[in-house]
Curated annotation (Swiss-Prot):
Pfam family, one: GST_N
Domain (GST N-terminal) ranges: 5-92
Binding site for substrate: Y120
Enzyme Commission no: 2.5.1.18
Domain of life: Eukaryota
Naturally occurring in which organism (per UniProt): Macaca fuscata fuscata
This protein's encoding gene: GSTM3
Reactions accelerated catalytically: RX + glutathione = an S-substituted glutathione + a halide anion + H(+)
Residue location of crosslink Glycyl lysine isopeptide (Lys-Gly) (interchain with G-Cter in SUMO2): K54, K73
Keyword hit for Transmembrane helix: no
EC class name: transferase
Name of the protein in question: Glutathione S-transferase Mu 3
Disulfide bonds: none
Length: 225
């Protein structure tokens, strides 16, 4: 860990949009501390822990997650990931790598949005079959894009691998057999989890696999799956 002053990552006490950020901070051996906010129980789901300070943190666009690094105060999860990644040359080097990074960064967010909408929908059980029906087609696109590369930008690890690992893992928890038809995606997951810093983090007390979503969600809202 760096001896410099720690970054502060603020987010709900869930996995959510902060998981890839936490993974990247751990992988890069960045000194950081977390400010975790707790959402209240049903039926009100009181968010006052966050709302009471939301406009007092000098954030340009107050939201969660946020990252504070000295005078730099950043919101938007992908902006946070890029900020950390730039410090470690993990945004792609060649033009081809940068294009692949940009594509997969946005594709992952589209994919994530679909799962989030399903998980928070009051019609979750009604909509779930359609999601599962379309899931193999979605995953096939990721599989074809990855091809024979080790990582999604090519042969060099970039921040989008952290994003992609997270959303593939969420879908794997949602439907445990969903990656079985895609050996290269399964190999990617194993390769990522075998990275020394990632493997150590997964085994640590700081890591939590669940809950993925907040308490008002219909799925992924419990400490265990």
């Amino acid at each position: 860990m760096s001896c410099e002053s720690s970054m502060v990552l603020g987010y709900w006490d869930i996995r959510g949009l902060a998981h890839a950020i936490r993974l990247l901070l751990e992988f890069t051996d960045t000194s950081y501390e977390e400010k975790r906010y707790t959402c209240g129980e049903a039926p009100d789901y009181d968010r006052s822990q966050w709302l009471d300070v939301k406009f007092k943190l000098d954030l340009d666009f107050p939201n969660l997650p946020y990252l504070m690094d000295g005078k730099n105060k950043i919101t938007q999860s992908n902006a946070i990931l890029r900020y950390i990644a730039r410090k470690h040359n993990m945004c792609g080097e060649t033009e081809e790598e940068k294009i692949r990074v940009d594509i997969i960064e946005n594709q992952v967010m589209d994919f994530r949005t679909q799962l989030i909408r399903l998980c928070y929908s009051s019609d979750h059980e009604k909509l779930k079959p359609q999601y599962l029906e379309e899931l193999p087609g979605q995953l096939k696109q990721f599989s074809v894009f990855l091809g024979k590369f080790s990582w999604f930008a090519g042969e060099k690890l970039t921040f989008v691998d952290f994003l992609t690992y997270d959303i593939l893992d969420q879908n794997r928890i949602f439907e445990p057999k969903c990656l079985d038809e895609f050996p290269n995606l399964k190999a990617f997951m194993c390769r990522f989890e075998a990275l020394e810093k990632i493997a150590a983090y997964i085994q640590s007390d700081q890591f939590f696999k669940m809950p993925i979503n907040n308490k008002m969600a219909q799925w992924g809202n419990k400490p265990v799956c």
